[in-house]
Amino acid sequence: MIVTTTPNIEGYQIATYHGIVTGEAILGANVIRDLFAGITDFIGGRSGAYEKELGRARETALSEMEEAARAKGANAVVGVDLDYEVINNMLMVSASGTAVTIA
């Protein structure tokens, strides 16, 4: 499945629009607390463990979005947007886009 942030896919025509699809992943309070503690410990550097955890959450959100697109009969998702939001000491990663069939 092609997933892109652009509104169209070069070399393809959008044959059908299937609507908006989303996927979410939430990191629990302990991960967030540890994440912010780690940030203060790694000022000026990078924490591979925390980046890996955020990457896992992002991949989960994108996978859920792709599954939702497949369920609608789509073979691509265009206009994808990723958002990160802290809610009640938890980090939510959400992915949204428009499910389409390309030809």
From Swiss-Prot:
InterPro entries per the UniProt record, alphabetical: UPF0145_dom_sf, UPF0145_YbjQ-like
Superkingdom of the source species: Bacteria
Family that this chain belongs to: Belongs to the UPF0145 family.
Entry protein name: UPF0145 protein RHOS4_20440
Organism: Cereibacter sphaeroides (strain ATCC 17023 / DSM 158 / JCM 6121 / CCUG 31486 / LMG 2827 / NBRC 12203 / NCIMB 8253 / ATH 2.4.1.) (Rhodobacter sphaeroides)
